């Protein structure tokens, strides 16, 4: 990590953060009004994530929300609307990321304890965390199956992909 190790100065960090944020909001403004209005919400969600591990075991949920901005944001950029389909796709991403991040956190449970960082494996144990990850991935598969009707043009290719992903997660 560049900032804690001193490879990047705090001044450089803030300059990059401010410049990136301005570029993000400007880019959203260039896309369409809805993207522009939602850009500040997206920034708050993304900025707040890095703090969540310091005070809640449910930081995995916040990370899922932050990453789900990408598919919903792409939808807003292209279609200039938020639809049920885009929210369902975003929800699938939320639950995929929750499960994935919990699995990843199981490998870091000891480091989380030492550094007093919060995670589901650190708070509830690895066994319970694995169950939460499984449920999260199952919810994701359900959302992807609900999307099947909307992805009618993809038909069997989409369904095969969902079945393959579900099979890999079960394996």
What are these regions (language model features)?
Residues 1-39, 114-165:
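Multi-pass membrane catalytic core of lipid/isoprenoid biosynthesis enzymes
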Residues 33-34, 55, 80-81, 106, ...:
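Membrane-interface elements of multi-pass transporters and channels
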């Amino acid at each position: 990590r560049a900032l804690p190790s001193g490879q990047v100065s705090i001044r450089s960090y803030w300059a990059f953060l401010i410049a990136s944020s301005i570029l993000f909001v400007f880019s959203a403004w260039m896309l369409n009004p809805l993207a522009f209005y939602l850009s500040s919400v997206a920034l708050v969600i993304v900025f707040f994530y890095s703090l969540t591990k310091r005070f809640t075991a449910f930081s995995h949920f916040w990370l899922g929300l932050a990453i789900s901005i990408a598919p919903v944001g792409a939808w807003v950029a292209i279609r200039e609307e938020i639809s049920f389909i885009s929210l369902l796709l975003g929800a699938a991403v939320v639950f995929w990321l929750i499960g994935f991040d919990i699995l990843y956190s199981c490998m870091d449970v000891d480091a989380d304890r030492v550094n007093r960082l919060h995670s589901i494996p650190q708070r509830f144990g690895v066994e319970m965390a694995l169950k939460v990850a499984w449920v999260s991935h199952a919810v994701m598969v359900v959302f992807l199956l609900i999307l099947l009707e909307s992805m009618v043009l993809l038909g069997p290719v989409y369904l095969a992909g969902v079945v393959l992903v579900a099979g890999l997660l079960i394996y």
